[in-house]
Amino acid sequence: MAAKMATMVALVFGLALLLSAAAPAAAQNCGCQDGYCCSQWGYCGTTEAYCGQGCQSGPCWGSGGEAAAGMAGRKAGAGAGVSVESVVTEAFFNGIKNQAPNGCAGKSFYTRQSFLNAARSYSGFANDRTNDDSKREIAAFFAHVTHETGHMCYINEINGANMDYCDKSNKQWPCQPGKKYYGRGPLQISWNFNYGPAGKNIGFDGLRDPDKVAQDPTISFKTALWFWMNNVHQVMSQGFGATIRAINGALECNGKNPGAVNARVNYYKDYCRQFGVSPGGNLYC
């Protein structure tokens, strides 16, 4: 009996060591910053899609104790940051949209309410630092939206149907026959490797039905916020220039398209002025 007990103790101890070694490895591979969850798909975020079922590391929901309590607070709208609704007023939103020509398809498509509906699914947006930082993040988001859509004029990328945005080497999110993954929505999400996981997170088949982004305004804003939270949000502390690099750096930064960079910066500075905050440093890329 003593021998069997010793064997069982050894097995339990060995299993504990194995599990303790596995957890840091998962966190290291995902690389999320503090306060963010690593989803089962390897993306960082703070909503249920990241911190719920399949969460690999970070303050996963159901992990208990302080982490779970903190996440519950964020779900309820507590914590740092400002009320997005109080900053993105009807006057601010329509002030952008009204600069687009009357014949623009986006003018009747994009609405403040659809943005607010989408923002409720991404509680980490503009909600994890100071009030001024939150306002700067909102200003940055809408600066890029303004530039990408021509003051919310465009829903679909100009001549996008003639472009090839299929990365055939990506086997996880394979392109579907007859489907096009050109830019759609507020941030003009493109490529199969973005449509696939965005749809998975939001709740539609992004690979088989990419046109959904141009048909449902709330889903359209959700894809923009999904992209933002996974690719841009984490660099906001580095200045607006870092957000340009995250969105379109390969085509605009390092002198490749100074006109586009200047346009984005000017929109950002204008929106910061409207929100009563300084734009901060490192504005260019």
UniProtKB/Swiss-Prot annotation:
The active site is at residue 148. GO terms for molecular function: chitin binding; chitinase activity; endochitinase activity. Keywords: Carbohydrate metabolism, Chitin degradation, Chitin-binding, Disulfide bond, Glycosidase, Hydrolase, Plant defense, Polysaccharide degradation, Signal. CDD domains: chitinase_GH19, ChtBD1. Residues 1-27 form the signal peptide. It holds the Pfam family Glyco_hydro_19. Residues 28-62 form the Chitin-binding type-1 domain. Disulfide bonds join 30-38, 32-44, 37-51, 55-60, 104-153, 166-175, 253-285. InterPro entries: Chitin-bd_1, Chitin-binding_1_CS, Endochitinase-like_sf, Glyco_hydro_19, Glyco_hydro_19_cat, Lysozyme-like_dom_sf. It comes from Oryza sativa subsp. japonica. It catalyses: Random endo-hydrolysis of N-acetyl-beta-D-glucosaminide (1->4)-beta-linkages in chitin and chitodextrins. Hydrolyzes chitin and may function in reproductive organs during embryogenesis and seed maturation. The keyword DNA damage does not apply. Belongs to the glycosyl hydrolase 19 family. Chitinase class IV subfamily. GO terms for biological process: cell wall macromolecule catabolic process; chitin catabolic process; defense response; polysaccharide catabolic process. Its EC number is 3.2.1.14. This is Chitinase 4. Expressed at low levels in leaves, sheaths and meristems.
